[in-house]
C-alpha cells in the first residue's frame, strides 16, 4: 500500500505525476492519498476517477506523520507500506524494497540543527531514551513491513503529532530514535545516504536550489523551493 500525504496546490500539482508513476509500475497496488486540509480538493475526485485512488478527505492538520498514522490505524493489516510525500516521483518498480523490513529514503545526523523539541516528552511518556546521537529519518519518508509500524505503535510513537513545520522537523528526529530502538542501522537502511552530505556543493544534489534528478528509483523533489505555500 502506498500512503501519500498531500497539501494540494493547483499551480504545482505534484501529486498527479507521483500517482501516475505509481500506477505505471504498480498497476494493482492500493494507493491512499490523505488530504492535509487543502483549499482546493478537486484533485481528489480526479485521482479516484482516473487512477482508482482511495482518498481520505479528513482535513489532516498533522502533516505527514498524521496521514501515515491515520491510514495505518484504518488499514492495519497490509503487508507493506510505502509512506510518501506528494512531492515525489516513482521512476521504477519498487517491489524489491519489500524484501527488507525497512528502507528510508535518506538520513541525517539528528543532533544537527537543534530540532529536538520532542526529546523530553519522549523520555517522559515512553520507555525509550531520546538520544541526540544517531540518525534522523528524512521526511519522514520510509517504506516498511507491517511489523515495523506495529512496533512503533506499541512504542507509543503515534502519541507525537506535528502541528507546525518545526514540529515536522522534530518528527524526523524522533522517528530516527524509534526506528533505531527497534535495532535498525538507519544508514544501512537508507537508499541514498545522508541528505546533508548530498546537499553540499560536492554532493549529488549540489548546492541550493539542489537538483534531485539523480535519485532512482524514487525521487524527492524540494517542493518548497517552488511552492511557497509549503514554507
Where are these regions (language model features)?
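ER/Golgi luminal nucleotide-sugar-dependent glycosyltransferases, focusing on the catalytic module
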Residues: 1-231
Amino acid at each position: 500500500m502506498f500512503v501519500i500525504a498531500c497539501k494540494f496546490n493547483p499551480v504545482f500539482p505534484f501529486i498527479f505525476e507521483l500517482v501516475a508513476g505509481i500506477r505505471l509500475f504498480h498497476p494493482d497496488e492500493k494507493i491512499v492519498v490523505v488530504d492535509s486540509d487543502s483549499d482546493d480538493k478537486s484533485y481528489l475526485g480526479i485521482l479516484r476517477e482516473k487512477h482508482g485512488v482511495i482518498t481520505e478527505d479528513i482535513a489532516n492538520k498533522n502533516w505527514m506523520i498524521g496521514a501515515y498514522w491515520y491510514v495505518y490505524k484504518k488499514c492495519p493489516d497490509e503487508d507493506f507500506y510505502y509512506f510518501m510525500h506528494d512531492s515525489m516521483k516513482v521512476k521504477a518498480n519498487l517491489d524489491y524494497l519489500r524484501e527488507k523490513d525497512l528502507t528510508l529514503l535518506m538520513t541525517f545526523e539528528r543532533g544537527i540543527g537543534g530540532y529536538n523539541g520532542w526529546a523530553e516528552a519522549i523520555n517522559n511518556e515512553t520507555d525509550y531514551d531520546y538520544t541526540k546521537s544517531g540518525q534522523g529519518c528524512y521526511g519522514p519518508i520510509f517504506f516498511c513491513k507491517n511489523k515495523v509500524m506495529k512496533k512503533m505503535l506499541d512504542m507509543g510513537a503515534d502519541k507525537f503529532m506535528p502541528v507546525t513545520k518545526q514540529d515536522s522537523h522534530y518528527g524526523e528526529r524522533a522517528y530516527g530514535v524509534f526506528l533505531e530502538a527497534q535495532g535498525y542501522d538507519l544508514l544501512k537502511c537508507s537508499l541514498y545516504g545522508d541528505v546533508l552530505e548530498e546537499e553540499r556543493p560536492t554532493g549529488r544534489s549540489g548546492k541550493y536550489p539542489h537538483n534531485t534528478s539523480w535519485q532512482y528509483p524514487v525521487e524527492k523533489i524540494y517542493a518548497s523551493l517552488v511552492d511557497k505555500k509549503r514554507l
